[in-house]
Structures are given as C-alpha cells and as structure tokens.
C-alpha cells in the first residue's frame, strides 16, 4: 500500500495539474470506487459537477482537494492499487478505469481514478473547522508535518504498552508510516521491531523520528517506492526508491552496515525485515 512518500508524490502532481480547475462532468464507472460516498455514485457526480478544486492536501496516507470554498473536500484513498492519473482526454481508457473527471477549460486533460483491486476510492465529505475531511479527523499528523509534536509523540510512546513497530503503524499516534518505511527507520535507528516503547528514552525516540523523516524525504526525492506498476505518479511514472532500501525486502542479503544476512519474520499478517546483529531483539522477545 502506498505510504506517505508515495501519496505526497501524487499530491504534488494534483497540485500542479488539477488545483484551480473546475469540474464539468464526472463519470462513475464502478460503484465500489465510491462506496465510501454513502449517498452513492449519482450524488457523487452531481455534487462534483461545477466544483472548483482548491489546493491539494495530505495527511499521512490520505489526500484531499477542497471544493465549495473549502466547506467540503474530495477525499482519496489509494488502497493497494489506486492511481490518480492526469491523462489527455483522447487517451485510451485504462483497463481498470473507475472514475473520470472532465474540466471546463481548454487544457485537454482529465483526471482518472484507476484501481485494479478496487480497495481504494474517492468520496465527498464535509470539512472540520481545521479544514480536514470529517472522516479522517482522528488521523494523527505525520512526521513531515511542520506542526508534528515530537515531545507529545515521545510521551505517548512511553505511556503505551506496545512495541515500537506497532506504534509506528498506529495512525492515531503518527500517520503515514507503513511497513516499508517502519522497517527502514528501525534499521537506521538500530532498533528491533519488538522493542517495548516504554524503554525508549527521549533521545532514542528523537533519533527514530529523525530517521523516519530522513528516509521519507529520501524516498520523496526518488519518486517513492514502486515494486510493480501499480504505484505511479499522476503522469503514470514509477518511483525508484526500491533500489535504495536498506531493510525491506532484503531477506538473505548482506546488511549494508555490518554484512550479516538480513532476516524476515512474520509479523501481524505482514513481514518485518531486520539485521539480527545491528537490531538485536529485546531480552523478553524470543
């Protein structure tokens, strides 16, 4: 699933190619693509027709574009395979095209939502006074947000009876971090994924946050991480940070720091990749 860097790449593309434009027509081609819009596809299309898109926004893995003078927003969640593509209006339809939005200008491009697995979707929601779509108001700020509170994050870590990777994936504590960048940040910080959060000192949690920010910024500079053709930017181009990963997906390969073969362990219906030498498990962990 796309994580913060991949979603931010898409947000920047929407900001460049879609913000400021007015929707003229919407086609909903698959009902699952608007299943989170409870009023249904007909209402979704009718409400968007004539709407002017504001500045594209993001929090964690969610992105949205305000409409109706920011009283509501078009919210997007890419799921496992969702793509928001800006395409020439005369370009052939993609096989898994789910939603098409046309604009009232002469630029000759349209916005398409393409989703092979249909886990993602688009929906319209009222905004909170802070400008967030109401349905994601509970999502915490992400580590690249200038208003992210490092001290509050450390305090929350110390108070929670959990482990460090579980905490990194808790979107009510810190958003935007998924399996890939959690493993990368933990490798850089030399922390085992099962390390209890209560044992982290303030300097260690600050170091971990710093590594999370560094790896996400590095991924952003390379267009994000693409393991297949399902993650692309709005122009259909893949990122290439997968070539720079230090932990994720590197089972059996030498650690880039010490040369020890990297390991993979099943973890919460996912996998965790780590170096058994650099990231020693806590004593209570088997």
Curated annotation (Swiss-Prot):
Source organism: Streptomyces griseus subsp. griseus (strain JCM 4626 / CBS 651.72 / NBRC 13350 / KCC S-0626 / ISP 5235)
Residues binding DNA: 96, 117, 160
Protein name: Formamidopyrimidine-DNA glycosylase
Family assignment from sequence similarity: Belongs to the FPG family.
UniProt-annotated catalytic positions: 2-3, 61, 270
Catalytic activity: Hydrolysis of DNA containing ring-opened 7-methylguanine residues, releasing 2,6-diamino-4-hydroxy-5-(N-methyl)formamidopyrimidine; 2'-deoxyribonucleotide-(2'-deoxyribose 5'-phosphate)-2'-deoxyribonucleotide-DNA = a 3'-end 2'-deoxyribonucleotide-(2,3-dehydro-2,3-deoxyribose 5'-phosphate)-DNA + a 5'-end 5'-phospho-2'-deoxyribonucleoside-DNA + H(+)
Subunit note: Monomer.
GO biological process, one term: base-excision repair
UniProt cross-references to SMART domains, sorted A to Z: Fapy_DNA_glyco, H2TH
CC cofactor: Zn(2+)
Enzyme Commission number: 3.2.2.23, 4.2.99.18
Source organism superkingdom: Bacteria
InterPro entries recorded: DNA_glyclase/AP_lyase_DNA-bd, DNA_glyclase_Znf_dom_DNA_BS, Formamido-pyr_DNA_Glyclase, FPG_cat, MutM-like_N-ter, Ribosomal_uS13-like_H2TH, Znf_DNA_glyclase/AP_lyase, Znf_FPG/IleRS
Keywords: DNA damage, DNA repair, DNA-binding, Glycosidase, Hydrolase, Lyase, Metal-binding, Multifunctional enzyme, Zinc, Zinc-finger
Role description: Involved in base excision repair of DNA damaged by oxidation or by mutagenic agents. Acts as a DNA glycosylase that recognizes and removes damaged bases. Has a preference for oxidized purines, such as 7,8-dihydro-8-oxoguanine (8-oxoG). Has AP (apurinic/apyrimidinic) lyase activity and introduces nicks in the DNA strand. Cleaves the DNA backbone by beta-delta elimination to generate a single-strand break at the site of the removed base with both 3'- and 5'-phosphates.
Any Pfam family matching the protein: zf-FPG_IleRS
GO molecular function: 8-oxo-7,8-dihydroguanine DNA N-glycosylase activity; class I DNA-(apurinic or apyrimidinic site) endonuclease activity; damaged DNA binding; zinc ion binding
UniProt cofactor note: Binds 1 zinc ion per subunit.
Ranges annotated as FPG-type zinc finger: 246-280
């Amino acid at each position: 699933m796309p994580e913060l860097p991949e979603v931010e790449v898409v947000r920047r593309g929407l900001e460049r190619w879609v913000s400021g434009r007015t929707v003229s027509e919407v086609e909903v081609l698959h009902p699952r693509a608007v299943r989170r819009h409870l009023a249904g596809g007909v209402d979704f299309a009718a409400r968007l027709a004539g709407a002017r898109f504001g500045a594209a926004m993001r929090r964690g893995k969610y992105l949205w574009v305000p409409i109706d003078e920011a009283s509501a927003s078009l919210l997007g969640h890419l799921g496992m395979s969702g793509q928001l593509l800006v395409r020439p209006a005369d370009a052939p339809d993609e096989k898994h095209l789910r939603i098409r939005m046309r604009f009232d200008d002469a630029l000759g491009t349209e916005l398409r939502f393409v989703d092979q697995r249909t886990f993602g979707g688009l929906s319209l929601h009222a905004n909170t006074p802070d400008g967030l779509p109401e349905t994601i108001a509970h999502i915490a700020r992400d580590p690249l947000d200038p208003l992210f509170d490092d001290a509050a994050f450390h305090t929350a870590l110390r108070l929670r009876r959990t482990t460090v990777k579980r905490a990194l994936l808790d979107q009510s504590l810190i958003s935007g971090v998924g399996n890939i960048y959690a493993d990368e940040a933990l490798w850089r910080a030399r922390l085992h994924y099962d390390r209890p959060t209560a044992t982290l000192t303030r300097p260690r949690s600050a170091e971990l946050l710093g590594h999370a920010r560094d790896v996400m910024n590095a991924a952003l500079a390379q267009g994000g991480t693409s393991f297949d053709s399902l993650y692309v930017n709005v122009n259909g181009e893949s990122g290439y940070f997968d070539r720079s990963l230090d932990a994720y997906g590197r089972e059996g390969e030498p650690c880039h720091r010490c040369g020890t073969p990297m390991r993979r362990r099943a973890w919460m219906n996912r996998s965790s990749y780590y170096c058994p030498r650099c990231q020693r498990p806590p004593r209570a962990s088997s």
